[in-house]
């Protein structure tokens, strides 16, 4: 039998290039293994270690998230699912004191006070052990760094679910502003922002640190880059994705930004300049997001200048039972990996996994089997509306929430977060309003020229009835006399709004206007809550053809008293309202007003028919119920 000669790759027309990085373990030749600090995080400045946070049903979230990541990134995770074989790598257990694998992490319980931080330390132990045992410039070490990065990204999304807002046009504009700020940052600007007055002097202020990260690495120049980095990213791509609406939520954008700099950490040696620049830009980006972007976003939202919205599905599940439940854990993982899972099918699976028990749900009253009512707020004062909306999803969770004391403490802590009162920054709001004030509201003194006086007082007929009731009738409870005088020559048109409060049942008033010119030359209008009110003068003019008896009935004795006998200011002739000269010159109008309970808006408008000059007086009258 003739043995055929195997064709070489070059003879078959293939390339003789071999990958630089080979899979598998590459143990170090050193006899002494470097020390591994198991209690120190890789990045102590990360918000995952700085903040005190909690994810409901954390064990279930970990298991679900790791399973999905393994399924998506099999090539990266395959070396870390199980512990190394004692048969093929016996020396591993002599050099590594605390071996760790994904299966070990999934089997542990992290639902206690320091559970989240210990979970992160166990995850980082994957790459710490790998770097201690293998050569640093090996594929397995690079993969271990990416495993830790991907897991921490998912935890970052879940941790910040309550502020992972949807990106609308206003939020997009803010993100673009801070992205451009990072792109234009120099070493001097970054140090001034991070260190303040203690920043070193004589730093470079011309070269932008972001230039090496703007575009993707060229495949022809560094083909081995794509053997290591499984998710390449560049700042220009992030900016383009943000502008075209590729990111639906804020942390989708944030994680891609962090991915740019993490890829530089993975590929380059820690002593390289680009590695240090990536660290600097990461710290500066975290500063911009945590110290400037989110506080500004919250401030704008409290002032009503921006609308912040959540993903309804994941947030409603998060709020169930104070943020607990298997549906919540599944929602967190699904939202983090929604591009790779069919949403509807997985939601059904999560519902099927819930172990409902309708016979052990304790409500108020006389039974365990009735539906929830709004009176059941004692079960959870912040979430009883959620309980009513989704009783089946929640009832199985109440039993689980009562199982341990730690769960109750976590729920109570979540409730206290819901009760947190936002701190409204009134100074910023006032500054913005002052900058946009119109000329109408400036503080320049501008006296009234057309309106000489506005006089508002109680209705005399009703007051007389209240103080002197008829024989056999019940006296009125309202016997207060009120009067308010507004002199135009002492007031400013730029401060034309006045307010006062009346006692209950004080709903009938009379308004008397005193002008500087005849009514023939001016046009007046009084509105109550945007409804026009006719004056007594107009009523009299419309009934001139009626008998004198009817005219007296229309005007009434109160009118005569108001016009002839009403005096102000101790009887000074110059301050008499409605004197005989006013009647002859026809410069006085009287309006009968009926107010409603609550806040009423009166506006008196006067316009000169010749010069078309207009003057206003606004009155806000609050009638107590």
Curated annotation (Swiss-Prot):
The source's superkingdom equals Eukaryota
GO terms (BP aspect): chromatin remodeling; nucleosome disassembly; transcription elongation by RNA polymerase II
Intracellular or extracellular location(s): Nucleus
Q: Does the keyword Transcription apply?
A: yes
Which segments constitute the Bromo domain?
Answer: 53-158, 181-292
CDD domains reported for this sequence: Bromodomain
Give the quaternary structure: Component of the two forms of the RSC complex composed of at least either RSC1 or RSC2, and ARP7, ARP9, LDB7, NPL6, RSC3, RSC30, RSC4, RSC58, RSC6, RSC8, RSC9, SFH1, STH1, HTL1 and probably RTT102. The complexes interact with histone and histone variant components of centromeric chromatin.
Protein name from the UniProt record = Chromatin structure-remodeling complex subunit RSC4
Name the encoding gene, please.
RSC4
């Amino acid at each position: 039998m003739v043995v055929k000669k195997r064709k070489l790759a070059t003879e078959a027309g293939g390339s003789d290039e071999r990958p630089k990085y080979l899979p598998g373990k590459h143990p170090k030749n050193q006899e002494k293994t470097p020390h591994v600090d198991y209690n120190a995080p890789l990045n102590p400045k990360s918000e995952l270690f700085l903040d005190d946070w909690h994810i409901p049903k954390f064990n279930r979230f970990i298991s679900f998230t790791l399973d999905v990541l393994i399924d998506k990134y099999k090539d990266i995770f395959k070396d870390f699912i199980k512990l190394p074989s004692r048969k093929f790598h016996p020396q591993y257990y002599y050099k590594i004191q605390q071996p760790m694998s994904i299966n070990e992490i999934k089997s542990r319980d992290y639902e206690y006070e320091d559970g989240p931080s210990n979970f992160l330390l166990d995850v980082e132990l994957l790459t710490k052990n790998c770097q201690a045992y293998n050569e640093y410039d090996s594929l397995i070490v690079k993969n271990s760094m990416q495993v830790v990065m991907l897991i921490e990204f998912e935890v970052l999304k879940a941790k910040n679910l309550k502020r992972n807002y949807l990106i609308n046009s206003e939020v997009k504009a803010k993100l673009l502003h801070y992205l451009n700020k990072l792109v234009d940052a120099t070493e001097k600007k970054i140090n001034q922002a991070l260190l303040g007055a203690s920043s070193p002097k004589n730093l470079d202020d011309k070269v932008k640190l972001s230039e090496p990260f703007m575009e993707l690495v060229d495949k022809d120049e560094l083909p081995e880059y794509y053997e290591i980095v499984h998710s390449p990213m560049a700042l220009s791509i992030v900016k383009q994705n943000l502008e075209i609406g590729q990111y639906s939520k804020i942390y989708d954008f944030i994680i891609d930004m962090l991915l740019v700099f993490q890829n530089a950490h993975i590929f380059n040696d820690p002593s390289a300049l680009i590695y240090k620049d990536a660290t600097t830009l990461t710290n500066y980006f975290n500063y911009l997001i945590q110290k400037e972007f989110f506080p500004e976003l919250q401030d704008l939202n409290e002032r009503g200048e921006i609308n912040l919205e959540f993903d309804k599905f994941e947030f409603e599940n998060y709020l169930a039972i104070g943020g607990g439940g298997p549906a919540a854990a599944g929602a967190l993982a699904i939202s983090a990996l929604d591009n790779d899972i069919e949403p509807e099918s997985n939601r059904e699976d999560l519902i099927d996994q819930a172990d409902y028990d309708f016979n052990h749900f304790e409500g108020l009253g006389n039974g365990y089997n009735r539906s929830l009512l709004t009176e059941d707020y004692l079960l959870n004062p912040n979430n009883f509306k959620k309980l009513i909306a989704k009783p089946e999803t929640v009832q199985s969770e109440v039993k689980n929430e009562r199982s341990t004391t730690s769960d109750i403490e976590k729920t109570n802590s979540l409730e206290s977060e819901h009760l947190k009162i936002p701190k409204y920054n009134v100074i910023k709001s006032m500054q913005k309003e002052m900058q946009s004030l119109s000329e109408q509201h400036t503080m320049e003194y501008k006296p009234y020229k057309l309106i000489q006086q506005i006089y508002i007082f109680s209705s005399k007929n009703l007051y007389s009835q209240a103080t002197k009731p008829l024989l056999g009738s019940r006296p009125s409870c309202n016997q207060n006399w009120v009067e308010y005088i507004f002199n135009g020559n002492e007031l400013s048109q730029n401060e034309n709004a006045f307010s006062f409060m009346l006692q209950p049942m004080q709903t009938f008033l009379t308004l008397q206007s005193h002008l500087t010119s005849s009514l023939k030359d001016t046009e007046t209008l009084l509105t109550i809550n945007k409804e026009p009110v006719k004056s007594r003068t107009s009523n009299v003019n419309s009934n001139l053809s009626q008998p004198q008896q009817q005219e007296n009935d229309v005007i009434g004795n109160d009118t005569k008293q108001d016009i002839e006998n009403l005096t102000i200011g101790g009887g000074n002739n110059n301050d008499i309202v409605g004197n005989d000269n006013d009647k002859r010159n026809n410069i006085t109008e009287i309006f009968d007003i009926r107010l409603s309970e609550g806040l009423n808006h009166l506006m008196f408008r006067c316009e000169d028919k010749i010069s078309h000059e207009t003057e206003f007086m606004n009155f806000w009258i609050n009638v107590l119920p």
